[in-house]
Amino acid sequence: MIRLVGKRGKGSFESQLDEAAKGKEFVQIDCTSDNTDKVMREGLSPFYIGPVECYDGLQSQTFESAWQCAKLYPNSVIDDCVDANRHPAPGYFAWRDKFWAKRYPEDFPNKSEIRFPAGRGNANKCIGAWWKVNGTFERLDYIPSRKAIYIPVYAKAVVKTEAYRRLVELRDSGKNLLLIDFDGYNIHHPKYNFTYRDAIHCWRLRMGHGFVLAMLLEGLIRVENGEVKYADGLMEETNREYSPDLRKLTEEEKLIRGAHEGGVTLEEWTALSLDDRRLLKKAAKTENAHARGFTKAAWMRLPVAEKFAILCGER
């Protein structure tokens, strides 16, 4: 049995277990940089694991920097980061390359710098992530970047480590594994009652590397000849409605939720006035889409300019 629990404000590990897991004996595995076992710490923590392959032959010395420095920010945060189209400008590449070349801990004065390379106070100002997907560079929103960057890059790196080999040996010997991560939670707990597919596509909750480890150990993800393979349906979008009481939303998550409900990108949503946001959210309701001759899915796929052209024609 594999279970994942969180370290950050989620109560005791025992309280996070579901009924099927309670009473079982688990081997506890701290997947973070707090692990006192050097092999496990440096083989599982995103701060240490690396070098990792990115794109076009480029490497980042740590997975954490690969992920954090794929993100784009306004020029007010990183000088000359993006051009008028919100694509990377020279300042972005200089910033990215600087951090991709650093090793942890020797090149970082503290954990905060590797975790927040644009500054702790700027984390919620990210306007997307820049990555090469199927041969084409794209600026990715929250969930697409999770699927195109976070999951596959970590999976390909971690399976090469001695730490992961130890986890596989424990699993294959019949041990129950309790993975512990800052951004983890037990999908089987009644509070969530998720599948891993739900967790991947849930914009309301963070998805830490512990989830990738759990999916690898459960056989939902595998790495074959350097390529990541997924169980059928795992990466397909879900229309599941998530319980509003999971936890209080951050300001960043409120924006992400609004963009999701309005059927636009996070960047487009951020640029809209409050009145236009309300208009888009109302128009995206199933009954209103049908009234305009669209299915909800078809309406959501329309470019934002086309949506407003239709809506403005009704005014």
Report the location of each language-model feature.
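Charged, low-complexity intrinsically disordered segments
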Residues: 1-314
